Curated annotation (Swiss-Prot):
GO terms of molecular function: oxidoreductase activity
Keyword NAD: yes
Protein name, entry field: Nodulation efficiency protein NfeD
Keywords: NAD, Oxidoreductase, Plasmid
Function of the molecule: Seems to be involved in the nodulation efficiency of R.meliloti GR4 on alfalfa roots.
Gene designation per UniProt: nfeD
CC per GO annotation: cytoplasm
Record's signal peptide: none
């Protein structure tokens, strides 16, 4: 055996039980590293075995944190119809000094957590001064974790949840650990028009489902996926940002440019955090932020899970 590798199954990752507050802090620290240029995060590359599916490779390196790894993640929306999860994947963590793998873990949980944490940190820095209502469109796992994470940043906010499946909304309300107040809403437009923060956490959409004209003055819009909004989201918003500008441009071009002038992207959320870009100038600004997911977030969250798993003796040691 050259070196031991710790295998963490989906059950093992769940047993680690990484606190949401810890995940939020990890993502904020990692965004600061990103803003200071202490990272390598090549735009994700992918293959598309089906027209409604993708498999992406996402490598990331955080020199300050001394963390390196790669996530191999698949999104198959049609899996739900046959009782399989729509998002599956693995994260491989490497020793940055030798390159040897040290851990392989299920990546579904950490993907959901880091995505919601990125939205919550974004909201911390870019929301209007008073957040009373948050619209979450989509009551799946992303919707659930967005409620959990955003309630840490906005504990007094009311969450208006929309989903085509009423049972999904009821299940979300039952599963939420925080004291967030959940209000079921039938129509996305109704929820969006009164919300101070809007999260669209549906499955991948091919057609326009949300009009930016519904967004009220001063709101922050957080799409989890690149499609689904009217093409003017990139031109009608007063401020347009992404989690990683190069990756956002690459992704949008690969999708056939569903939005208008993406050159209006001022920078990244991390640029706002480090003071290189002005985010919200006043409470009337409508701000759109495309957090499409960056590998350094996966590596940072996965590393925290790995550290706790080692301390608790979780997982299976395999030879390499």
């Amino acid at each position: 055996m050259i070196a031991p590798v710790r295998w963490l199954s989906r059950k093992d990752v769940a047993l680690v039980n990484l606190p949401f507050a810890s995940a939020l802090n990890i993502i904020e620290v990692t965004l600061r590293d990103h803003g200071n240029g202490a990272f390598e995060n090549p735009p994700k590359i992918g293959i598309h075995p089906r027209h409604d599916a993708l498999i992406h490779a996402m490598p990331g390196w955080l020199p300050t944190q001394r963390r390196a790894g790669l996530k191999w993640i698949a999104t198959y929306s049609s899996n739900r119809s046959v009782g399989l999860p729509s998002i599956t994947g693995l994260l491989v963590l490497n020793d940055p000094d030798t390159g040897l793998p040290v851990c392989v873990m299920d990546a579904a949980y950490l993907t959901a957590v880091r995505t919601a944490a990125a939205s919550a940190v974004t909201s911390k820095y870019l929301s209007p001064s008073h957040v009373r209502k948050i619209a979450v469109i989509g009551a799946g796992i992303q919707g659930l974790y967005h409620v959990e994470m955003l309630s840490l940043v906005h504990p007094a906010a009311e969450f208006h949840i929309v989903d085509i499946d009423d049972d999904a909304v009821r299940l979300l309300a039952q599963m939420v650990r925080s004291k967030a107040r959940i209000v079921p809403v039938k129509e996305a437009e109704i929820a969006i028009r009164t919300a101070d923060v809007v999260v669209t956490a549906t499955s991948q959409l091919e057609e326009v489902a949300f009009q930016f004209s519904w967004v009220k003055e001063g709101s922050l819009v957080l799409p989890v996926h690149p499609r689904g909004w009217s093409e003017d989201i990139t031109t009608a918003s007063e401020v347009l940002l992404a989690d990683d500008v190069a990756q956002f441009a690459s992704y949008i071009m690969a999708l056939g440019s569903p939005y208008r002038d993406i050159s209006r992207v001022l920078g990244s959320v991390s640029d706002v955090i480090t003071g290189q870009v002005t985010g919200r100038a006043n409470d009337s600004d409508r701000i759109a932020v495309f957090n499409l997911g960056i590998a350094v977030h996966d590596v940072a969250i996965g590393s925290a899970i790995f550290d706790i798993a080692e301390q608790l003796g979780l997982g299976t040691i395999v030879s390499y």
